[in-house]
């Protein structure tokens, strides 16, 4: 079966047949993220992440289950490359600035180094000043999509990219594992989500995806 699949995706036309779903996009564009046989729950997780009609989604999974690679690498790339008109402003949020920088670096690495992306979508920095627009925490693509990384300490409400407010906000591991046993810290997280994140997405009718342990 896999030999036939490999032959089918050997051309751009073949690969394009699968990119309508997040699972298909991952298989043809990010195969290096899938060295192990997927579990049954991966298909369900991808279906939920890839459902544009789900405005509020929380995915809780054990460390190493693939939720972060699906939610913070595959999902923003898929939306930015396949649905730029629907998702022109993608926001990734993590607990700390260092974590934010890592999220953006992972996305940028695929945009710059992934041979399939280069073949099928071209240089996504073409016509964009990489020195100005490709930073440690922000990327603007040639199709106009902006991927912005923010930490919990930074303001979300009122953010704009050109005429666009955030179209999807993806929050990855919003709580530090070392602090999560403290009620005060958990209360601050809930206050932040209710007081900052949810009002921000309500302003623009955006999607909210939260990934946690």
Language-model segments: which ranges?
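Short, flexible loop motifs at catalytic/binding sites
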Residues: 1-213
């Amino acid at each position: 079966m896999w030999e036939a699949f490999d032959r089918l995706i050997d051309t751009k036309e073949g690969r394009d047949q699968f990119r309508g779903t997040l699972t298909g996009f991952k298989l043809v564009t990010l195969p290096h993220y899938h060295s192990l046989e997927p579990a049954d729950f991966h298909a369900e997780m991808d279906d939920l992440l890839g459902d544009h009609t789900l405005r509020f989604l929380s995915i809780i999974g054990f460390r190493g289950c693939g939720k972060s690679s699906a939610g913070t690498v595959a999902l923003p790339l898929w939306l930015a490359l396949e649905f730029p008109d629907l998702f022109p402003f993608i926001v990734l949020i993590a607990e700390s600035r260092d974590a934010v920088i890592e999220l953006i670096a992972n996305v940028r690495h695929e945009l710059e180094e992934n041979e399939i992306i280069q073949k099928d979508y071209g240089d996504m920095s073409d016509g964009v000043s990489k020195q100005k627009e490709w930073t440690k925490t922000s990327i603007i693509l040639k199709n106009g999509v902006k991927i912005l990384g923010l930490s919990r300490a930074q303001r979300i409400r009122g953010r704009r990219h050109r005429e666009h407010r955030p179209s999807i906000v993806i929050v990855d591991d919003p709580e530090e594992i070392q602090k999560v046993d403290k009620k005060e810290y958990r209360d601050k997280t809930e206050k932040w989500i209710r007081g900052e994140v949810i009002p921000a997405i309500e302003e623009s009718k955006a999607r909210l995806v939260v990934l946690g342990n």
